Amino acid sequence: GDHRDLHLSIRRQRQMCIRDSVYTPGHTSNHMCFALQEQKALFTGDHVMGWSTSIVSPPDGDMSDYLDSLELLLQRDDQVYWPTHGPCIDEPKAHVRAFIQHRQEREQQIIDCIEQGIFKIGEMVPAMYHDTPEFMYPAAARSVLAAMDNLVKKNRVIVVSGSGLEGEYQLSAS
């Protein structure tokens, strides 16, 4: 049957046996997804949500791990995702690819900001999230920090002074 049959089955049984766990660090360092292999269904928790990308907030969240975990999910054969937040995801591979592309676009926005002379995360957030309500800027800053940490790991950006949200960043010479 399709995923609606799975939903009805879970509602009627109220419990199920899951034998396959998938370690997906990134959103948090210990995040796990759980699979029902026979149904090709994956319970994605907060790693892949149905309505938005997950926040990745250092130090427990790590963007490099998050992206690696998304790539891992692309290698799986799941036909439906059941996230903790949002509707079920009927086209998981397309959804995951869109999340990866979104994170790559955010990294490019950071590089664009630095090229325009914006070197601090607090100043990048309004430029990058101009369509986001201001009360969400602190969460957005945590996400920018995670992307910045990933750019530093990849040696595309260097820390000039300070650290974290208070740091000043520039493009790497290499």
Write out the residue ranges for each language-model feature.
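Amphipathic coiled-coil/heptad-repeat helices and related helical stalk/stem segments
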Residues: 1-2, 66, 144
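Single conserved hydrophobic/aromatic residue that forms the stacking wall/gate
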Residues: 1-18
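Conserved acidic
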Residues: 2, 6, 95, 136
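Residue-level signal for the nucleotide or nucleotide-sugar donor/cofactor binding architecture
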Residues: 5, 61, 139
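Short beta-strand element of the conserved SAM-dependent methyltransferase core
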Residues: 18, 32-34, 168-171
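Metallo-beta-lactamase
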Residues: 21-107
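C-terminal regulatory/interaction regions
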Residues: 112-174
